[in-house]
């Protein structure tokens, strides 16, 4: 929930203009353009253009840019609004209809302009904004996904609804997954803005108050459709004492989301059903498509979504991406944040005098992080239309002897069939229950590890001021008594991802919910025995937090990943605690093996002519999955085991090791090396050889 306390004396109709405006300015100026936050020690010290300075959003943006220390604030608006813009803090205003507007802006900024917020965002404004950028290039933040002609000017756009951190759609067809990092930023920025409004440092755009209460809202929408009052786009409608005003915001333009064309070369002769549309399921689908096999993803949610804020991939995982499909790796690199150094640093967080426990070289641009949602966004762009079925909650699987296909049953009463079913449905996998069999077996479900995490995203300028450059732009792990913390940059380096783990001897109170409400006070208490650096990290977390329970499959591992023509992959097969940061990477390894096996199986079936083959199609596919099980089971189970143990080592809970630096370093090194240095090419060779043996080809 996003709430701001309105100062006494501010009229409701003024207050109702703040919600969308504050959110949009926060996203545009600070998340997209990277301005330092008001009140921080850093200052912008560069010029900025606010296109549409007399709009509600533009009026706020001018004031925030001034508070962030911009050396020169330029705006565009009608001449009759020049005085208004000046009163807000604009240094110069230009008429956007003036044919010489661009040149005047360039002259005013001495051709050095590199930051622009377009608060109108039409095709015409986009071209003007891009043209006004100086000769060294820059960035324009739009309110819509617009394009311009200049290649040296980066185009970004924001959508205020993402600040709620929830899935939403526009017109039922344009779907946007949850972005938890936007919610965390919005909470922080709204709290900051609350103080600025209370101190009188932010003035609202004058609203227009309509008549006829809620009924008048429709008149307001109609006026905006007809192009009336486009600049003052805030409306209040008096509806009574209990609800005095309503803020109506409408956009007359539509969003166009590009779709990847259907892959006409992908075959449907081998029907593959993937249950689950997270990173594990989508990477597998792309790997199959690369090999000419068109799968169908059955996702129980209404859209693609990933739980959690940050994610990183170790060197082995990046290698597996390239094997699976080089475009997957390219997509990952497009959204990653480059570390300040190519080292992973483990620190003793319990000693006031800083001490490095261990450092490991990651390789060039190794183990980089990104926002989970950003990576998934990039991946799904490559999925052909028709690859995904949303709102499909699996309830049963039927794999009968003699049947040509496996049947899937969903909670909405629908069914589907496929030759192969692969469960990528996460830690609470329904497919895992089928593979293991029996009624309510312990291995059907993950179990609480007696650790939970506080997660938070900290604005980078705030983190930089508190910790310095090295501790903010490079991956750090802080070890200590019964707790440990991880930090690394995400969101283009604008945010520091903080994950603070705590040991909990109690049982988890709610078996249905993996997150429960908490506060910063809880986190501060959990890390009170740590040094000032770690306490400073914890102190930067938001006041309202969640406790994220760490569940895994260590206590009751799946004895097999395969049953007949059904298998499980990723967290569905081997959910591990996140202390190695390797769970998603192992899912990519799984996907590489599965994609190659199904490709080999399909090639074998094409050559042998299914109708006359000595080995029936169903048997070939079973042997492919048996090969997958043989290749992946031991390594995946080891990951679950080592992840549990390394978490205990990080927190001084191994009696033989404690927090002894030499012993900790030795454990960290060999365990990480076994993950990072894994020979993916050799794994693929072993896979091919074993499958051929299964078929009697060698």
Curated annotation (Swiss-Prot):
Top enzyme class: oxidoreductase
One Gene Ontology MF term: oxidoreductase activity, acting on NAD(P)H
Active site: 455
Amino acids binding FAD: 299, 312, 372, 571, 584
Keywords: FAD, Flavoprotein, NADP, Nucleotide-binding, Oxidoreductase
UniProt key word Transport: no
Disulfide cysteine pairs (residue numbers): none
EC number: 1.-.-.-
Source superkingdom: Eukaryota
Name this polypeptide is given: Dual trans-enoyl reductase/FAD-dependent monooxygenase tazHJ
Family: In the N-terminal section; belongs to the zinc-containing alcohol dehydrogenase family.
Residues given in the record as NADP(+) binding sites: 54-57, 78-81, 96, 279-280
InterPro entries (alphabetical): ADH-like_C (IPR013149), FAD-bd (IPR002938), FAD/NAD-bd_sf (IPR036188), FAD_monoxygenase (IPR051104), NAD(P)-bd_dom_sf (IPR036291), Trans-enoyl_RdTase-like (IPR047122)
Disruption phenotype: Does not affect the accumulation of azaterrilone A.
Purpose of the protein: Dual trans-enoyl reductase/FAD-dependent monooxygenase; part of the gene cluster that mediates the biosynthesis of azaterrilone A and other azaphilones, a class of fungal metabolites characterized by a highly oxygenated pyrano-quinone bicyclic core and exhibiting a broad range of bioactivities.
Associated pathway: Secondary metabolite biosynthesis
Keyword NADP: yes
